[in-house]
């Protein structure tokens, strides 16, 4: 399907992922091996946690399940299944991480195994304990528990360095003293091989001496790097003597000033997997070209008796590509720092902390991950698939309430002045066991401004002069007139009601009307701040354009980006096909209004979810909602309003 235009693929995917799977949860321990020097690690067969949620989607078909099933059938790992989720603690998790979390913890749970939470804390310039705490909280929020299996790459710094010295003594690594520009010049290209640098043939003794002096802090940042000696002519750039250690005189948030020599990810994560006895190392497709290096490092160490067999295997799956959002850390940081959003937990942000405030649910993310499946090829998922999944989950679980967002006054002229009564409405129309609540009705009501029209358009079945509608869960009313202010705006709608038509009473449905509107008693309604959130961007691919064109092309996909390591520094590929993604911000992505809600909502607490009847799904804000100040955020509308928008 990847050959199809993006717009066609999006329409196909929106129709495809609408099944509703069942749910399971499993838990079982697995063994764990580490060298003697890492004495604080759990011993083999120590009990640990797997997915501990009661709402994990049931297994569906994907290639990773088939691989694990085959390994289990062949006893490749003795029946063990150990996965891991290894985020770098340099930012907040986003929607794409949710897919990986659900996948890794879910596969472990399905097979009675464990999933490790490991922080890849190898770059002290960017990492902080704040991010670690947020990441751990987000994983727990999604419904998963790593038990005793919470680790850090820095747990293994001593062992990693010991292995680095071993690579040097075996003639498999050397200290390179070239500058970053010099390394780049000798690296070669995708079509031309690299050339050996002047320091590639240093003696073992000289390399070992330099490496130990690097560790001792004798050299400045960038003076030397440690590289593996593999093959400068390899067609795979990652195998052209990759850098595995760099000098950085920077305090680490866990190890303090103990180290000024830090390992790089490609060297660290494969060894960490092997130390933790991970069986299936699952990552996204951009690491596919790194797999030969992954295998080379741990295979050499196993051959040297430094790691146990069987070794972990790396498998790649397609990352989440979602329309109408950006997931790049650089772009997300720009949105925050430039004030385009109200922080990392802004409900419009595709971060998990933002999703939580938006009202997206853990069960919704798990269901979304199951619906979109696991693929080996990149494709785009339309935002409507995620939104529809959240609607399905919220529709099944949230109670109903009434809220008037744009109120005008309605007076029932034949209703006794000063009196009121209780009408009753189900908390959930499909779940009678959730009971019902009382809603007070009186002479003066609030209704939505759009539910009255002086001159109605064709097909309008709500309130108009002389027309009848039913007050939801109440009476049938007939419009007898209306008042306007000096500017010609309708201020009050006047009606009469039929006492014989009260909902739920005998004969109430004898007279049928097409219109049905919601309302609130003016005397009893509770004011609330309502934040109407929508998509942050107004186009599917923010910033995308055809090369040389200054306007976005229909269905155009963003230019691919990647990073390589030169002399220990990550270098991003130029995004020369992008224009400014900020030009595509949606100016209507946030609107704050003062509305009225039914009295029952005065008792709502933060993170309570509701369907505001006829409006959509809302949540009491995690941060700002309190008994003195009711604040509700719109999660999603009742129906997809974007599919009909132009462009």
Per-region residue spans from a language model:
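Long, charged, mostly alpha-helical binding arms that flank functional sites
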Residues: 309-389
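N-terminal Rossmann-like or analogous alpha/beta NTP/dinucleotide-binding catalytic cores
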Residues: 21-23, 28-196, 259, 286-314, ...
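Glycine- and acidic
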Residues: 82-90, 115-122, 274-282, 346-352, ...
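Active-site cores that bind ATP or allylic diphosphates and position pyrophosphate for catalysis
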Residues: 123, 129, 166-332, 390, ...
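Core subunits and conserved enzymes of cellular information-processing
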Residues: 291, 295-297, 370-373, 380-647
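Acidic, Ala/Val/Gly-enriched low-complexity intrinsically disordered segments
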Residues: 6-8, 24, 559
